């Protein structure tokens, strides 16, 4: 099996580090991974590791092969952990994590971060994503209409939380106010968090705040509301299996380097 780890020509440190860890992990399994800054039309790898969907779109038309997408993870610390999934971003990827055991959750994440359900917050939180981001690339986003619909559907104030990295990409969304604090503070005080498919849904579910999401790329798609019909009385499903499954989407660099991640992901080829 031939596996290539693609990094951009500028060789960003996080991409190179992920590629080196992945190649080290493959070596533990008797496989060789090659790091490359170029993927041509005659490329013959069976699998290409790429960081981010921009690189995936660069590579896939040329290689016509599967890709394994490395990205920021879902449970914190998102900059320490790396998510690894086949052929898609977030919930569009394949992680082979359905009905996972709870060992990874208990080992790494069962530290009190999963709070009891508490749908009694003082406002509805609308979290914005970056305009043009890959996660909403094919979704018809109209945040102003969504804010208007929310205000009609609830007596609670609707607060808008802009994306912390790039603010203002959607202009000024008219609602009942804005939330300028951290996402952790924002979801803790909300009755419901409303998002297209952002990771604020994960933060919210962990905080015990129900979520409305509108796109199946969301990592809380299976346990969140899909529309506004239950906004005033949200369901409170068991989150145990969701937490166990999500723990099998992300890996520490050292787990990748010793082959633990590939031990799980290689089942695609068995």
What residue spans do the PLM features occupy?
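N-terminal pre-catalytic "stem/leader" segment of glycosyltransferase-like enzymes
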Residues: 1-47, 132-133, 267-270
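Short loop/turn segments at strand-loop or loop-helix junctions that form parts
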Residues: 5-9, 70-74, 121-133, 161-164, ...
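Catalytic donor nucleotide-activated moiety binding site of glycosyltransferases and closely related
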Residues: 7-11, 144-180
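Well-ordered, non-membrane alpha-helical segments in soluble/globular domains
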Residues: 16-22, 140-153
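Short, well-ordered secondary-structure micro-motifs within conserved domains or adaptor modules
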Residues: 37-62, 66-71, 192-196
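A donor-sugar binding/catalytic signature common to diverse glycosyltransferases
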Residues: 53, 180-225
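A short, gly/pro- and small-residue-rich
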Residues: 54-85, 144-145, 206-220
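Leloir-type glycosyltransferase catalytic cores
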Residues: 81-122, 137, 221-270
């Amino acid at each position: 099996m031939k596996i290539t780890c693609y990094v951009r020509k500028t060789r960003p440190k996080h991409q190179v580090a992920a590629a080196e860890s992945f190649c080290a992990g493959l070596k533990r399994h008797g496989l060789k991974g090659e790091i490359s800054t170029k993927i041509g039309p005659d490329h013959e790898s069976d699998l290409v590791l790429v960081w981010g969907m921009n690189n995936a779109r660069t590579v896939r038309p040329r290689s016509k092969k599967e890709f394994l997408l490395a990205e920021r993870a879902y449970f914190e610390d998102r900059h320490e952990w790396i998510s690894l999934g086949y052929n898609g971003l977030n919930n569009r990827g394949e992680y082979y994590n359905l009905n996972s055991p709870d060992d990874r959750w208990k080992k790494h994440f069962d530290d009190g971060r999963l709070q009891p359900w508490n749908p009694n917050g003082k406002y509805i939180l609308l979290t914005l994503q970056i305009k043009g981001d890959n996660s909403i690339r094919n979704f018809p986003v109209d945040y102003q209409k969504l804010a208007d619909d929310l205000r009609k559907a609830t007596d609670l104030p609707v607060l808008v939380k802009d994306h912390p990295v790039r603010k203002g990409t959607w202009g000024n969304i008219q609602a009942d106010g804005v939330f300028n604090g951290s996402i952790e503070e924002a979801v803790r005080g909300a009755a419901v968090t409303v998002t297209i498919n952002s990771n604020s849904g994960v933060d919210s579910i962990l905080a015990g705040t129900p979520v409305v999401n509108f796109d199946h790329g969301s990592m809380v798609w299976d346990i969140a509301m899909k529309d506004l019909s239950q906004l005033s009385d949200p369901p409170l499903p068991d989150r145990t299996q969701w937490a166990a499954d999500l723990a099998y989407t992300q890996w520490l660099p050292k787990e990748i380097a010793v082959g633990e991640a590939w031990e799980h992901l290689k089942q695609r080829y068995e």
